[in-house]
Amino acid sequence: MRCPYCQSEDTQVKDSRPAEDGAAIRRRRACPVCGGRFTTFERVQLRDLVVVKRTGRKVPFDRDKLHRSFEIALRKRNVDPDRVERAVTGIVRQLESFGENEISTDDIGLLVMEALKSLDDVAYVRYASVYRNFREAKDFQDVLGELRGEPELE
């Protein structure tokens, strides 16, 4: 593994342990050249997923982008980072188990909303406002009604 500090190819694993409920291996590494220390995660990748955008454009699935979506929705919210990581890992597992290599942004968005609903109501509303492209205050009222279990009014 290349050192992120000095780009040396010669790094050493100092410690390995299971992470994310056994779904990954966390490795603590050290660079003998510059003395830098860093952590890497090793995960199983069942298949190469491709995201189909609303425009029809296809891009490789990016787990980090999914994680950033959670971070943006949860900004300044007090949610345990381990719960967020478990939610992201759960979504990736669901996507891989769909049996399809191509996944629509709509499918991903629905899974994110479902996960956020159980993590934090405010983050759920934030994400929904972007995902559903809210245009007026009534859109917020509708999603708040969903959270309270009220029937949707048309």
UniProtKB/Swiss-Prot annotation:
GO molecular function list: ATP binding; DNA binding; zinc ion binding
GO biological process, one term: negative regulation of DNA-templated transcription
Zinc finger (unnamed) stretch: 3-34
Cofactor note (record): Binds 1 zinc ion.
InterPro entries tied to this protein: ATP-cone_dom, NrdR-like_N, RNR_NrdR-like
Domain of life: Bacteria
UniProt-listed Pfam families: ATP-cone (PF03477), Zn_ribbon_NrdR (PF22811)
Keyword Nucleotide-binding: yes
Keywords: ATP-binding, DNA-binding, Metal-binding, Nucleotide-binding, Repressor, Transcription, Transcription regulation, Zinc, Zinc-finger
Cofactor: Zn(2+)
Domain ATP-cone, chain residue ranges per copy: 49-139
Family matches, as PANTHER family: TRANSCRIPTIONAL REPRESSOR NRDR
Chain's role: Negatively regulates transcription of bacterial ribonucleotide reductase nrd genes and operons by binding to NrdR-boxes.
Family named by the database record: Belongs to the NrdR family.
HAMAP family, A to Z: NrdR
Record protein name field: Transcriptional repressor NrdR
Organism: Chelativorans sp. (strain BNC1)
Gene name of the encoded protein: nrdR
